[in-house]
């Protein structure tokens, strides 16, 4: 889940960037998307993807009843496969979906970001589990560890891991 502080922080990053196009991988309750939409420029849009179709009945009412519903496109589907088909260049991306596919989400985000755009990746400290050797059955922790190593060694980007709650990595 996303905390009030983290969502508020993300919204401020959007305001500072003067972002008008934002993509989110992993909607869950829609809270992050709503906070991001509040920080968008006039005419800006958040495209938020949730791969778990069973989440729709819970999430859609929160988004549709929010004061920024007109700035959010809630999409049930796989962002990794579907977002590039939009043909949109985004200012920012927020990765907070399946930890096992963070690297794929990251590569997709890079492919749809404008030059100088930002990626925010959530849960990159994963409650401290990234400091331990994961059990072979713990694919979520392994996914985050692999992502952290991948980004750390990616010379295409600048990055900083912020030790906010569960970890937030800012990538440009």
Language model regions located:
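Short, small-residue-biased leader/transition segments that mark boundaries at the very start
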Residues: 1-4
């Amino acid at each position: 889940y996303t905390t009030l502080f983290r969502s508020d922080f993300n919204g401020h990053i959007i305001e500072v960037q003067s972002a008008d196009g934002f993509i989110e991988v992993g909607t869950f309750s829609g809270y992050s998307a709503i906070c991001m939409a509040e920080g968008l420029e006039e005419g800006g849009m958040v495209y938020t993807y949730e791969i778990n179709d069973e989440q729709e009945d819970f999430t859609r009412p929160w988004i549709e009843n929010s004061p920024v519903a007109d700035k959010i496109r809630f999409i049930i589907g796989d962002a990794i496969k579907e977002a590039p088909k939009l043909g949109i260049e985004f200012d920012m991306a927020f990765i907070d979906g399946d930890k096992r596919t963070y690297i794929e989400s990251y590569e997709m985000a890079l492919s749809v970001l404008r030059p100088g755009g930002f990626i925010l990746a959530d849960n990159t400290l994963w409650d401290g589990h990234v400091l331990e050797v994961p059990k072979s059955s713990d694919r979520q922790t392994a996914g985050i560890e692999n992502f952290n190593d991948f980004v750390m060694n990616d010379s295409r980007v600048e990055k900083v891991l912020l030790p906010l709650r569960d970890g937030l990595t800012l990538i440009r």
